[in-house]
């Protein structure tokens, strides 16, 4: 594909245009008086969102170089979302102002490299001050953080606070859609562990990049699976039952993984595969815990159990399993509650007789996972659009609350960033060089989130900043008053602010040091088929793939591709895949 090249100021200006386009759409979503963004969907009703990452992902620009800028700032939002679960709009706002200030100084003759060094030096100062101002969160603060992150919605704050109180920080909280109009909290058995899907092709929700299995059957084994030959009998039985299927094994690789993906994508079997958590002997213990939770039999090599002898009675079950790229959450049925409690009591006895502190810690971790349970927040709404909106707000609020528990909180509303900006300004050397200018870029950027919060609430951002500095109090955008934001319960998770700063400086520094941008030139869309083309003519079909022992993929022969008449590909009939074919 031909490439478009852009150099020097031209490339940076085009990148900045893309960054500004995305940032201007995103920054209306910050603060308690934030505005919504409506996103058209190809199918179904439009989405109404107030989440920076979601908005940024939807924007594509005609100019290839500007679109690179749009994708770079979208990367900032996505990375912050992935790491902290919140703070995407703050990260976007910071990136935009840093890029604007950086490019303005470069146009005036500043050295990009020295600016970058100054920005990184300023960032280190800010992070050190941020850590010193952070305070540990207590029970009453959880509701405050959740409420602020939910845009001031006290109902969301209350339900998250209640869920946290019941399952504790070791438990699991999941958010799902409800059939009723009310948002409810339900506590059930379950656990999560740090292993994700073995292949991204198992994803069922492309937007959230997760795999969800409703009422699945579960095979649990400590064996490595590299071929599905031994699993054909049980796979056929599961297919007949029309249930989703999860394979939890020491490893799933090679031909076995390829064949599962093929069957998943062809609609033959709704399946996913996950590697077992932990390592060595602890891996088997973890699998035993999961087997008890789900009512499964652990198919173990130690007991000479063979995969080809597995029956439906050996499989476990769950209400729902959610798998991301690095985490699996199991929502179990309550009928295993007594068995789980017995297991917990047994583990507690092991703790008492174990001498190794390390082993005690590991056993206590298992107890916490089993006993913590799962809190289900069931989101109710009158319409599908409202449902999606509320669910996204609750997920953001939940992520922010977890981040607050991890690293503590600071004064919200951008107040802490303003304080640090003043401290950074006061520490500035009275010299004029490019490195110092880079520090100044950070100093000024720290004011921008509060300016935008004020603007979204209908106030002049510059006036609000001046009043905050004069009064020594924070700005409460809910009521337009200047207050002690800690006492008002307006708190931000330290982790969210830290990651927003780190991610924004990282991308902004890369952009201002960019000299050349290379992008694909979009090819013009050709008319379907072309003159005289047979619309149904096409590539000779792929002949039917060999049967899969009852689970065969339907043959694909004869499915011509429109517009490519006369270019037949030789059939591939009879090429059965090994194992289940």
From Swiss-Prot:
Catalysed reactions listed for this entry: ATP + H2O + a folded polypeptide = ADP + phosphate + an unfolded polypeptide
Subcellular location: Cytoplasm
Highest taxon, organism lineage: Bacteria
Positions contributing to ATP binding: 29-32, 86-90, 413, 492
Assembly and oligomerization: Forms a cylinder of 14 subunits composed of two heptameric rings stacked back-to-back. Interacts with the co-chaperonin GroES.
GO cellular component: cytoplasm
Protein name per UniProt: Chaperonin GroEL 1
Gene that encodes the chain: groEL1
NCBIfam families registered for this protein in UniProt: GroEL, PRK00013.1, PRK12849.1, PRK12850.1, PRK12851.1
Function noted in UniProt: Together with its co-chaperonin GroES, plays an essential role in assisting protein folding. The GroEL-GroES system forms a nano-cage that allows encapsulation of the non-native substrate proteins and provides a physical environment optimized to promote and accelerate protein folding.
Organism name: Prochlorococcus marinus subsp. pastoris (strain CCMP1986 / NIES-2087 / MED4)
Protein family per UniProt: Belongs to the chaperonin (HSP60) family.
GO annotation (BP), single: protein refolding
Keywords: ATP-binding, Chaperone, Cytoplasm, Isomerase, Nucleotide-binding
GO molecular function terms noted in the UniProt entry: ATP binding; ATP-dependent protein folding chaperone; isomerase activity; unfolded protein binding
């Amino acid at each position: 594909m031909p490439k478009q090249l852009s150099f020097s100021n031209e490339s940076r200006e085009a990148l900045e245009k893309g960054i500004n386009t995305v940032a201007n759409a995103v920054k209306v979503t910050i603060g308690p008086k934030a505005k919504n963004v409506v996103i058209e969907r190809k199918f179904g009703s439009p989405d109404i969102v107030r989440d920076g990452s979601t908005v940024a992902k939807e924007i594509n620009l005609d100019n290839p170089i500007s679109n690179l800028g749009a994708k770079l700032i979208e990367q900032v939002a996505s990375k912050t979302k992935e790491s902290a679960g919140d703070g995407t709009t703050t990260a976007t706002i910071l990136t935009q102002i840093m890029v604007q200030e950086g490019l303005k100084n470069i146009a005036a003759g500043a050295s990009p490299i020295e600016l970058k060094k100054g920005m990184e030096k300023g960032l280190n100062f800010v992070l050190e001050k941020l850590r010193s101002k952070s305070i540990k969160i207590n029970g009453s603060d959880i509701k405050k953080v959740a409420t602020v992150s939910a845009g001031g919605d006290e109902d969301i704050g209350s339900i998250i606070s209640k869920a946290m109180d019941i399952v504790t920080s070791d438990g699991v909280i999941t958010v799902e859609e409800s059939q009723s109009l009310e948002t409810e909290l339900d506590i059930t058995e379950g656990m999560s562990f740090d292993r994700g899907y073995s292949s991204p092709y198992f994803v069922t929700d492309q937007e959230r990049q997760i795999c969800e299995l409703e009422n699945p059957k579960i095979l649990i084994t400590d064996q490595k699976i590299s071929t599905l030959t031994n699993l054909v009998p049980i796979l056929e039985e599961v297919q007949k039952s029309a249930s989703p299927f999860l394979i939890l094994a020491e490893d799933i690789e090679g031909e076995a993984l390829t064949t599962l993906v093929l069957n998943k994508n062809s609609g033959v079997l709704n399946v996913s595969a996950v590697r077992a958590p932990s390592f060595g002997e602890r891996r088997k213990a973890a699998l035993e815990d999961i087997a008890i939770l789900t009512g499964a039999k652990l198919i173990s090599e130690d007991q000479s159990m063979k995969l080809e002898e597995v029956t439906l009675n050996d499989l476990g079950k769950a209400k729902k399993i959610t798998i991301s790229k690095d985490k699996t959450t199991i929502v179990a049925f309550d009928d295993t509650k007594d068995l789980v409690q017995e297991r917990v009591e047994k583990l507690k006895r092991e703790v008492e007789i174990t001498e190794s502190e390390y082993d005690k810690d590991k056993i206590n971790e298992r107890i916490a996972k089993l006993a913590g349970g799962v809190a289900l927040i069931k989101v109710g709404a009158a319409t599908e659009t409202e449902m999606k909106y509320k669910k996204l707000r609750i997920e953001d609020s939940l992520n922010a609350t977890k981040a607050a528990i991890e690293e503590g909180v600071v004064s919200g509303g951008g107040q802490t960033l303003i304080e640090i900006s003043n401290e950074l300004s006061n520490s500035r050397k009275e010299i004029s060089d490019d490195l110092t200018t880079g520090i100044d870029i950070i100093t000024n950027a720290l004011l921008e989130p509060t300016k935008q919060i004020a603007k979204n609430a209908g106030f002049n951002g510059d006036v609000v900043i001046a009043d905050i500095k004069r009064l020594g109090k924070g700005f409460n955008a809910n009521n337009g008053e200047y207050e002690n934001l800690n006492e008002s319960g307006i708190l931000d998770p330290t982790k969210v602010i830290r990651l927003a700063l780190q991610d924004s400086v990282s991308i902004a520094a890369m952009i201002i040091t960019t000299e050349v941008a290379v992008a694909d030139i979009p090819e013009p869309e050709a008319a379907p088929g072309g003159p005289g083309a047979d619309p149904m003519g096409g590539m000779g079909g792929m002949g039917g793939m060999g049967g899969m022992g009852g689970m065969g993929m339907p043959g694909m022969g004869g499915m011509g591709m429109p517009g490519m008449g006369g270019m037949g590909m030789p059939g591939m009939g009879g090429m059965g895949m090994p194992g289940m074919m």
